[in-house]
Amino acid sequence: MKIRRLICAALAASLALCPAAFAADTAPKTDRIVTTQNGTGYSVSSVGRHIIPVSDSSQSFDFSPLDGYDLSTLIISDGKYTDRANVVHLDNDLTLNGVTYPIHYQSKTDNGGTSVIRATVDIPAAQDDVTLSAETVST
């Protein structure tokens, strides 16, 4: 639905613009690549292709727990800005370059009866939203 709305809005805007407006220079967009990390007890992944305009030289984006796969602190970074969220109380957000990204939590029990906590951050992007998540065994 979001993509359909964006396409309709883009078509409406293009009909409203005169041909001279199409000749105007637009800022190029840079592919932002979400780094994937794997390790015992947690995984970090991205969902969807995303293009985000960047004003710095960074072309990478990292989302990770602390070393040792400790989910008490999550780290978000685009190479220039970094923020850490203490998630022990399950109520903190991540802020990157003045933008706040809420952290969502889920607790589940896997097939082996182990309790797992998953922290997820949704990042709205120009094309598709990016969902980053990390999970660890609850202690």
Model-derived regions, located:
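Bacterial N-terminal signal peptides that target proteins for export
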Residues: 1-7
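Bacterial N-terminal signal peptides
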Residues: 10-18
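Sec-dependent signal peptide cleavage junction
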Residues: 17-30
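A short, amphipathic beta-strand motif
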Residues: 28-38, 134, 139
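Small-residue (G/S/T/A) turn/hinge positions that recur once per unit in extracellular repeat modules
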Residues: 39-49, 79
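Short, solvent-exposed loop/linker segments at the N-terminal edge
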Residues: 50-55
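Surface-exposed interfaces of beta-sheet-rich extracellular modules
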Residues: 58-113
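Extracellular interaction modules
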Residues: 102-138
